[in-house]
């Protein structure tokens, strides 16, 4: 039997091609470069250095413009002519300012400083103040009280008012316990705080420090400070005074 060979035509179409809308796109990145193409720089704006570099002009020479050339110009300049021209210009400006001041008049009833752009002042300035005082003079001082009867009433009126009394106790003051029924009788301490009719007193005695509250009636203000060693030593003060009096007596 004769063998028959059947040849199948091969379809040679690209695999990685897309025929969407009749366009073919290559998805292979073999021939594509990673970096974008360089942009061409526009040559429209180019800066050109037109000035010259002169060290003496940059540094200023001896403090004048253009260095040595500036000094020569200053030496050749005529100062008298410039002074005359400047004086003439100043006179013209003064005349113009005087004319403007004469044209600008402030009424006496108006606020001068407010009209000129400032604040405050009296209406009409000093003239307005004088006219106001003339029209509204200050009231005369009250006459002294006539003396009636004895001089006691006059002395009473001449006395100065008394200064207000200080409160009984304030924080920082020194107080002593005057309640004989209290175990802290004649103890002396420093007032720390006062609330609701009571005061907290700090007794300092070396290692013995204690803060105790008392009623205001139980305490009395004291000028002399508390003893440094023992707060109970205040009890001995009257005894020491009595002993000193007995020793001083013959």
UniProtKB/Swiss-Prot annotation:
It catalyses: a plastoquinone + NADH + (n+1) H(+)(in) = a plastoquinol + NAD(+) + n H(+)(out); a plastoquinone + NADPH + (n+1) H(+)(in) = a plastoquinol + NADP(+) + n H(+)(out). Residues 136-146 have a biased composition (Pro residues). The keyword Transferase does not apply. Residues 76-94, 106-115 have a biased composition (Basic and acidic residues). InterPro entries: NdhS. Residues 76-163, 222-250 are annotated as: Disordered. Pfam families: NdhS. It is found in: Plastid, Chloroplast thylakoid membrane. Residues 1-48 form a transit peptide. Its main location: plastid. Coiled coil: none annotated. GO terms for cellular component: chloroplast; chloroplast thylakoid; chloroplast thylakoid membrane; cytosol; NAD(P)H dehydrogenase complex (plastoquinone). There is a cross-link at residue 52 (Glycyl lysine isopeptide (Lys-Gly) (interchain with G-Cter in ubiquitin)). Disruption phenotype: Malfunction of the NDH complex. Arg-193 is the critical site for the high affinity binding of NDH to ferredoxin. GO terms for molecular function: quinone binding. It is a peripheral membrane protein. The keyword NAD applies. NDH shuttles electrons from NAD(P)H:plastoquinone, via FMN and iron-sulfur (Fe-S) centers, to quinones in the photosynthetic chain and possibly in a chloroplast respiratory chain. The immediate electron acceptor for the enzyme in this species is believed to be plastoquinone. Couples the redox reaction to proton translocation, and thus conserves the redox energy in a proton gradient. Required for the efficient operation of ferredoxin-dependent plastoquinone reduction. Forms the electron donor-binding subcomplex in association with the NDHT and NDHU subunits. This is NAD(P)H-quinone oxidoreductase subunit S, chloroplastic. The lineage of its organism: Eukaryota, Viridiplantae, Streptophyta, Embryophyta, Tracheophyta.
């Amino acid at each position: 039997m004769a063998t028959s060979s059947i040849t199948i035509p091969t379809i040679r179409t690209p695999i990685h091609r897309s025929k969407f809308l009749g366009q073919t796109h290559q998805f292979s990145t073999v021939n594509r470069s990673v970096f974008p193409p360089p942009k061409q720089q526009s040559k429209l704006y180019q800066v050109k250095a037109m000035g010259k570099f002169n060290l003496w002009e940059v540094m200023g020479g001896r403090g004048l413009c253009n260095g040595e050339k500036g000094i020569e110009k200053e030496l050749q300049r005529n100062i008298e002519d410039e002074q005359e021209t400047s004086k003439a210009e100043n006179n013209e400006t003064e005349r113009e300012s005087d004319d403007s001041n004469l044209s600008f008049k402030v009424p006496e009833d108006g606020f001068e400083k407010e009209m000129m752009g400032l604040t405050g002042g009296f209406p009409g300035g000093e003239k307005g103040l004088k006219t106001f005082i003339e029209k509204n003079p200050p009231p005369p001082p009250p006459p002294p009280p006539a003396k009636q009867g004895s001089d006691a009433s006059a002395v009473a009126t001449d006395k100065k008012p008394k200064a207000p009394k200080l409160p009984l106790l304030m924080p920082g003051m020194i107080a002593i316990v005057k309640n004989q029924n209290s175990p802290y009788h004649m103890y002396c301490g420093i007032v720390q705080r006062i609330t609701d009719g009571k005061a907290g007193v700090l007794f300092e005695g070396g290692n013995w420090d204690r803060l105790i509250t008392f009623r205001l009636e139980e305490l009395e203000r004291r000028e002399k400070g508390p003893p440094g060693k023992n707060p109970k030593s205040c009890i001995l003060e009257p005894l020491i005074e009595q002993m000193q009096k007995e020793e001083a007596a013959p």
